[in-house]
Structures are given as structure tokens and as C-alpha cells.
Amino acid sequence: MMALSTLILISLHTLCTKTSCKPALPFDKLPKTKDAYIDQQAIMAVLGFMVVLRVMAFLPLGATVRTATGMEVRMNGFYTLLGLLFLMPALVYKKVDLSLVRKKYFYLMTASLIWAFVTALIGRLLARFRPGKKANVNARGNTGNFIVDFFKGREFNPSLLGVDLKLQAYRFSLIGMALINVVLVIENIMSRGGAVNHLVTLASAFQVLYALDAMFFEQYYFLSYDAMNTGFGFHLTSSLHSFPFLPTLITKYLIDRQ
């Protein structure tokens, strides 16, 4: 199941290219070498984004919510997203190369999946060596089978250094989606000499609006099914870390085919 979900995601990005987007068996188009999946710059870029989200989580903005484990967390995802969006004009002014996202889009996706694996492993180790309250134990992730437990997650809401890991993964998914959209649109406008493709902009804007709405009502995340009933395993982390590369596939497709 772990391999299948990853294979489906990678297949979506290999089947749709600049020249065609036809249904076919994905195995013929899947890259066969390690270098086709792993890029050090992309891995460090995703890690840097995760570090930024982690640092921003300590901003004294937004309401505080008590999680199922009894830990109080600051719901400042909306302010984090706004701050990063407001940073975009500064990046353009400083002539920062934003083409990295488009050129290494596939590598960024695989890097996100790699970090999803690492994050799930951290959650597994925390549950093993620093278990939380009994109410935080996921019965479906405590079977004794390492693969099943790693996939399902032994705990619902593990925390590390005062940060809820599940909330961080949730922010990664939505804030990441918004930023990728904005960067793709900005880079597209700049590459076209200032000409705006309204279809691309509109498709991207709806996705950014979705992320803004989700982050504005972030405090209700802990009442969702994922927060209350899904263990923090690779099943969840891979889903959240890969999410930015599903809606943005539409934006990238429109840019490639314009």
C-alpha cells in the first residue's frame, strides 16, 4: 500500500508532459535511475521550508488550542501563510531565481515524500522511546507488526520540541500548495515579459483561496477526522506531504500547454 500510493502520485506526473497527457501504463514512463528521483538541492529546499514552518509556529499570534494530548499549540498558520505570501514581492525585487520550483517540480515532490518517510519514522521512534498518554495511542497502529504500525502510526498526535507534528504536516500541505502556485504564476509572468495568462492565474487563485480559508479556520483542524482518528504514520504523512503536488499539477499543466 505504501508503494502503491507513491507510485500513483509519481505516475500522474510522468504521464502528463508538455507534449502529451494520454492514459497509459505508467511503468514505461517511470524513470529507472536514482538520479531521476533524488536531487540534493530539492531535498534541502523542502527541508528549509519545513524549518521555516517550524520556526513560524512559535510566533505569538493566533489563538491557542489544547490538543488531545493536553498540549497547547498556537494556531498561527494563517499568519504564517500571509507572511510568506507577502515575502514574494521582495523575492521578485531581489531577482531571486524562482524557476527552481518549475524546473525541479518533480524533484521537490520526491523530496517531500522522502521527508514524509523521515517524519513518520520520527513519530514511530517518539512513540517507542517517549510514549505519550494512553488516550494518544492509536489501536490500529499497535499491532506488533512494524510495517503496519509504521504505516498506520502508533500515536495520534506526537509532539517534538513543543510542536505538534501532525499540525506541522497539515500546514506543510496547504501552505506548500499556496506557495507553489504563487511561485509558478510569478515565474510564468516574468518569463512571458509581463504578459498574464488569465486561465493560469485563475486556476492558481482558487487554490490559494482554498489554502487561505483552511488556514483561517485552522483552529478547527483538531475536530477533523484526520486529527482525531488517524494515526501519525506514513499513511498520513505521505498524504499531507504529497498534497501540494496534486492541485498544483493543474497549474503546471496549464503553464506547460499554454
Q: What do the predicted segments below correspond to?
A:
Residues 1-257:
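Membrane-anchoring alpha-helices and their flanking helix-loop junctions
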